[in-house]
Amino acid sequence: METLYNGTLSLGGKDQESTGFAWWSGNARLINLSGRLLGAHVAHAGLIVFWAGAMNLFEVAHFVPEKPMYEQGLILLPHLASLGYGVGPGGEVIDTFPYFVSGVLHLISSAVLGFGGVYHSLIGPETLEETFPFFGYTWKDKNKMTSILGFHLIILGFGAWLLVWKAMYFGGVYDTWAPGGGDTRIITNPTTNPAVIFGYLLKSPFGGDGWIVSVDNMEDIIGGHIWIGTLEIFGGIWHIFTQPWAWTRRAFVWSGEAYLSYSLGAIALMGFVACCMGWFNNTAYPSEFYGPTGPEASQSQAFTFLVRDQRLGANVASAQGPTGLGKYLMRSPTGEIIFGGETMRFWDFRGPWLEPLRGPNGLDLNKLKNDIQPWQERRAAEYMTHAPLGSLNSVGGVATEINSVNFVSPRSWLATSHFCLGFFFFVGHLWHAGRARAAAAGFEKGIDRLTEPVLSLKPLD
């Protein structure tokens, strides 16, 4: 039998009597034990990074280069491919070794974090204030809290700049808009014009406006990261070297549970934004890796049948459909030439395989008759049969599959999971904000635990 580092392994102030929280309340028992709470957070980070590394290696082991990523149920390799690792023209995977390296690095990192989590949870000091005052804190210390906020902002800003450096100096990133069907390229001229970058924030979120989700070129994405990274770094320095203003002290609740609620609210917003980005955007989330968007699959089907019937002799410019509108082509509300049929609802779709066929007034008839390239036909046919949809009825005219066809788009997985998680985080935000505000007002201690069913169970030890 091995000797434990800490022979006592006593609860040490983590029991119900001393904290007001029982074991099933988890980290709430550690609210006033900064060292133990550090251990919980480091261990949690270790679990997250372990999942990333293990799942990364799992996807590498199962990856078949001859098939598109979105046909293989992958969600991590598409992210690495979007960063320009291992991919060449057209999104073709030419080297899987960078993916293997990524998985191994994450696994090694998770081991370090896991050790740190166990150490600080069991062996290290329970509180940091006495031995390491720089890392110690009290929740009501407003200056310390904003300093911690500042350090977090600087780290986030550095993370944003990592993408900028990767795109500009270290191999570039994958650009689905590169001529000929996408390629990995260096971003040499990122957009730094604040009117363009912050213009996205001022746009309507509805329809073709699409708020920040409407970003459609890599220059704006990298330029946006330059702005956000710089603002976060300078904002972090500001928060470290200043104290909160009087109105800030009055406006906010300054307690551990309040900070939890703020964090949950922020991550809920990020979950909802990620949901919309993953579902609609085909620049930050290239369709070569994630599969087509819903509008993209619908438009590609209309394009595929236009190509087929044009070859069979149809006059695609004048043919009428069953409603009397154009069967293949029609006019948009603003007078542009667009695809006809049910896909008319997606008339403002933009995609790299379709844009070369547009002119000043929408789709160019001359280009449709003479300039369609084989790669555009192949890509549209592939996207048409991989819509991010189940077998629904109202799907923009996309031919749905029989139930035995087992395809679920990564866009469906990512959008659904981020929406659901964002919603749960938002509910948690409301819950903890309500508790924190009530506690600050002095009239709410929490739910009466006298009737808690768990209290009737035998103690774990």
Curated annotation (Swiss-Prot):
Per the record, what is one GO cellular component? Answer: chloroplast thylakoid membrane
A GO molecular function held by the record: metal ion binding
Q: Which ranges does the record mark as transmembrane?
A: 57-81, 122-143, 166-188, 243-263, 279-300, 435-459
Quote the SUPFAM superfamilies the UniProt record gives.
Answer: Photosystem II antenna protein-like
Q: What subcellular compartments does it reside in? A: Plastid, Chloroplast thylakoid membrane
Could you tell me which residues carry N-acetylthreonine? 3
Where do the annotations place [CaMn4O5] cluster binding? Answer: 355
Record's bilayer topology term: Multi-pass membrane protein
Entry keyword set: Acetylation, Chlorophyll, Chloroplast, Chromophore, Manganese, Membrane, Metal-binding, Phosphoprotein, Photosynthesis, Photosystem II, Plastid, Thylakoid, Transmembrane, Transmembrane helix
Maturation propeptide residues:
1-2
The reply to whether Phosphoprotein figures as a keyword in the UniProt entry is: yes
Q: How is the cofactor bound?
A: Binds multiple chlorophylls and provides some of the ligands for the Ca-4Mn-5O cluster of the oxygen-evolving complex. It may also provide a ligand for a Cl- that is required for oxygen evolution. PSII binds additional chlorophylls, carotenoids and specific lipids.
Principal localisation: plastid
Q: Which domain of life is it from?
A: Eukaryota
The answer to keyword S-adenosyl-L-methionine applying to this record is no
Instruction: List the InterPro entries hit by this protein, alphabetically.
Output: PS_antenna-like, PS_II_antenna-like_sf, PSII_PsbC, PSII_PsbC_sf
Q: Biological process GO annotation list?
A: photosynthetic electron transport in photosystem II
Q: Which Pfam families match?
A: PSII
- In the record, Phosphothreonine modifications are located at 3
> What is the role of the protein in this entry?
One of the components of the core complex of photosystem II (PSII). It binds chlorophyll and helps catalyze the primary light-induced photochemical processes of PSII. PSII is a light-driven water:plastoquinone oxidoreductase, using light energy to abstract electrons from H(2)O, generating O(2) and a proton gradient subsequently used for ATP formation.
Subunit comment: PSII is composed of 1 copy each of membrane proteins PsbA, PsbB, PsbC, PsbD, PsbE, PsbF, PsbH, PsbI, PsbJ, PsbK, PsbL, PsbM, PsbT, PsbX, PsbY, PsbZ, Psb30/Ycf12, at least 3 peripheral proteins of the oxygen-evolving complex and a large number of cofactors. It forms dimeric complexes.
| Family, as annotated | Belongs to the PsbB/PsbC family. PsbC subfamily.
Q: What is this protein called?
A: Photosystem II CP43 reaction center protein
